[in-house]
From Swiss-Prot:
Similarity remark: Belongs to the mannose-6-phosphate isomerase type 2 family.
Source organism superkingdom: Bacteria
PANTHER family hit by this protein: MANNOSE-1-PHOSPHATE GUANYLYLTRANSFERASE
EC number: 2.7.7.13
Keyword tags: GTP-binding, Lipopolysaccharide biosynthesis, Nucleotide-binding, Nucleotidyltransferase, Transferase
Protein name: Mannose-1-phosphate guanylyltransferase 2
Originating species: Escherichia coli O157:H7
GO biological process: GDP-mannose biosynthetic process; lipopolysaccharide biosynthetic process
Length: 482
């Protein structure tokens, strides 16, 4: 019997706050370029080039759909393969939906699912690929394989896997190096983590899994039939919408929320662990990002326009301004267009407290950056004051803004580069570089980029209310545009 095809299932729905102010609710860390020229999501997908995989499935939520689609398009991985969760229900249901879809896509086969987080770093990519190849026959045998990271130090922020006896070798193979799992352990205290470190039989839980789609669904049906039944219904009613696989919100919101660890892994007798050293990090804090980054002779990590004098072991990031640091040590400084973080490295775990304060004060800095992505391009809110807002808008070639109007504001557009095709009422006009056009309050208008280069323009809005919800669409260019 030939081996089943491998389908990577990439979980990209998180909204983490531990890397604020770079990571925001609408632009979390999986979409950031933290190590190299690609984002963590893109790197996760490109890492699979060392394996023989079918096109991957990426699971995300409604809010992130356009960012995910654009990042997949940039690396030529966009192919109707983004599953949109209408509401978050943790990993067990998300993986179940993926398993049903994989079986539907491969009706004559029982594909292997390789479950990955979109926001992890794996430095030793060839070792990772070798580990997956070694696990393939084990998973084809019907085992549920999890990959345990050989710990480098006593870490209290990770869950652990306690190994048992060596698993039964495959026919024709010597010891495969896979162990049965005794138990999964939640994040330990410091004393317990030290014991795990010295025991030699505990591994960090990486959240990387490999199993047959049918095996996962069988175990889920055995231990959590309530989740299985809802996901079966949801998967059967899913439908394709452009690059997205959409699920029924009415059905999916009835699904219990549960992690794969609690729903299946802690209960199944089919689980084996493969210990690996793949240079893994979940990049869960500014400290861990400093740990894995390339450093200067003084131990500094500097990203952006940075000047330093007499500094040591700092992480300094600048998005849009010159940052100068003098005489500091073991600090984190992160500058974005609308926020600056300054912290001791030893205190960065308290970043979540700042995010909680922003939420209580109903500020927007925890939700989004100044720069916001849309299916047609992006905009950057440059300035705002009483009765006015200034944006820089970039429209991709061939894309445009749907026919719309505003009740509370008028707009002036000044084209910086490219060509704008503007429909205002019953008239259409081309507006080119150094030209402008006025959109009166209450007027119906649309904007297109008919050219082959990006359209850059400045928008100045003025009126009593300037919120993004004062957009009355009369004809949608993109389904579910915002």
């Amino acid at each position: 019997m030939s081996d089943a095809p491998i389908i990577a299932v990439v979980m990209a729905g998180g909204t983490g706050s531990r890397l604020w102010p770079l990571s925001r609710e609408l632009y979390p860390k999986q979409f950031l370029q933290l190590s190299g020229d690609n984002t963590l999501l893109q790197t996760t997908l490109l890492r699979l080039s060392g394996l023989s995989c079918q096109k991957p499935l990426v699971i995300t939520n409604e809010q992130h759909r356009f960012v995910v689609a654009e990042q997949l398009r940039e690396i030529n991985k966009l192919n109707g393969n983004i599953i949109l969760e209408p509401c978050g229900r943790n990993t067990a249901p998300a993986i179940a939906i993926s398993a049903f879809h994989a079986l539907k896509r491969n009706p004559q086969e029982d594909p292997l699912l390789l479950v990955l987080a979109a926001d992890h770093v794996i430095a030793k990519e060839s070792v990772f690929c070798d580990a997956i190849k070694n696990a393939t026959p084990i998973a084809n045998q019907g085992k549920i394989v999890t990959f345990g990271i050989i710990p480098e130090y006593a870490e209290t922020g990770y869950g652990y896997i306690e190994r048992g006896e060596l698993s039964v070798p495959l026919q024709g193979h010597e010891n495969t190096g896979f162990y049965y799992v005794n138990k999964f352990v939640e994040k330990p205290n410091r004393e317990t983590a030290e014991l795990y470190m010295t025991s030699g039989n505990h591994y960090w839980n990486s959240g990387i899994f490999m199993f047959k789609a049918s095996v996962y669904l069988e175990e889920l049906r055995k231990f959590r039939p309530d989740i299985y039944n809802v996901c079966e219904q949801v998967a059967s009613s899913s439908y394709i919408d452009l690059d997205f696989i959409r699920l029924s919100k009415e059905q999916f919101q009835d699904c219990p929320a549960e992690s794969i660890d609690f729903a299946v892994m802690e209960k199944t007798e089919k689980c084996v662990v493969c210990p690996v050293d793949i240079g893994w990090s979940d990049v869960g804090s500014w400290q861990s990002l400093w740990d894995i980054s390339l450093k200067s002779k003084t131990g500094d990590v500097c990203k952006g326009d940075i000047l330093t004098y007499d500094t040591k072991n700092n992480y300094i990031y600048s998005e849009s301004a010159l940052v100068a640091a003098i005489g500091i040590e073991d600090m984190v400084i992160v500058q974005t267009k609308d926020a600056v973080l300054v912290s001791k490295k030893s205190d960065v775990q308290h970043v979540k407290k700042i995010v909680e304060m922003l939420k209580l004060q109903q500020r927007t800095e925890y939700i989004s950056h100044r720069e916001v992505f849309r299916p047609w391009g992006k905009f950057d809110s440059i300035d705002q004051g009483e009765r006015y807002k200034v944006k820089k808008i970039i429209v991709k070639p061939g894309e445009g803004l749907s026919l719309r109007m505003h009740h509370h504001r008028s707009e002036h557009w000044i084209v910086l580069s490219g060509t704008a095709k503007v429909t205002l009422g019953d008239k259409t006009k081309l507006v080119t570089a150094n030209e402008s056009i006025y959109i009166p309050l209450g007027a119906a208008y649309s904007l297109e980029n008919p050219g082959i280069i990006p359209l850059n323009l400045i928008e100045v809005s003025s009126g009593d209310y300037l919120g993004e919800d004062d957009i009355i669409r009369q004809k949608e260019r993109y389904k579910h545009e915002d």
